[in-house]
């Protein structure tokens, strides 16, 4: 006699949720594998200058530099040494 039951969803839901049901990964750039070389080259040239400008506070503005840009390590060390020397000088008085 042939087997009648071929599929069951028993315990499947628990197993599926054990590691969480995740969204499918959306890749930013599709593969250009197998694309004609001339077409791919033209696409690369066409893409130049089409970068999306950043939208800041209601209109298109230039992105401003940070108020406190990151300092080089030498500058930080020199400032710390100067601060320590000032503390020692104040303690001697």
Swiss-Prot record:
- The UniProt regions of compositional bias labelled Basic residues, in chain numbering, are 1-31
InterPro entries named among the record's database cross-references:
Ribosomal_eL29
Q: What GO CC terms are in its UniProt record?
A: cytosolic large ribosomal subunit
What are the record keywords, sorted? Ribonucleoprotein, Ribosomal protein
Q: Does the keyword Ribosomal protein apply?
A: yes
Biological process (GO), any one: cytoplasmic translation
**Presence of keyword Ribonucleoprotein:** yes
Q: What GO MF annotations does this protein's record show?
A: structural constituent of ribosome
Q: Where is this region: Disordered?
A: 1-33
Q: So what family is this one in?
A: Belongs to the eukaryotic ribosomal protein eL29 family.
* UniProt protein name: Large ribosomal subunit protein eL29
State the organism of origin.
Dictyostelium discoideum (Social amoeba)
Question: What does UniProt list as this organism's lineage?
Answer: Eukaryota, Amoebozoa, Evosea, Eumycetozoa, Dictyostelia
Q: Which gene encodes it?
A: rpl29
